[in-house]
Amino acid sequence: MPYKKNYKRSAYNTLGYLGEVLIILFLKCKLYHIIKHRYRCPLGEIDIIAHKNKQLVFVEVKTSLFNKNIPITYKQQKSILKSAKYFIAFHRKFANYSIRFDLYFFSLSTGLIHIPNAWQES
């Protein structure tokens, strides 16, 4: 039984990774520069960090095979906010950039849904 559980987790990780790669290609087509993919720090993880025209975008990607909108929790939002602050603290060249937090949903049935400014620091 543990094999099936690990296999399922691996399949979800692969699906999530493919969704992130798709969004990276989408952002590159929109002329964004990708800074980091799967950025990790002691405070959390950010799927994609990109910039364009003095705007720094922190992206969360949710991927599903079917029409299943996967919510982003308040706890996840706070983790991404803290990780973004950590990133900027160690990459001072982005300190004067405007910041945006975007959310992308992707599924085979609904396609790509982009929510710019999905949340803000409160």
Curated annotation (Swiss-Prot):
GO terms for molecular function: nucleic acid binding. SUPFAM superfamilies: Restriction endonuclease-like (SSF52980). It comes from the Bacteria. InterPro entries: Restrct_endonuc-II-like (IPR011335), tRNA_endonuc-like_dom_sf (IPR011856), UPF0102_YraN-like (IPR003509). PANTHER family: UPF0102 PROTEIN YRAN. Belongs to the UPF0102 family. NCBIfam families: PRK14683.1. This is UPF0102 protein Erum0631/ERWE_CDS_00560.
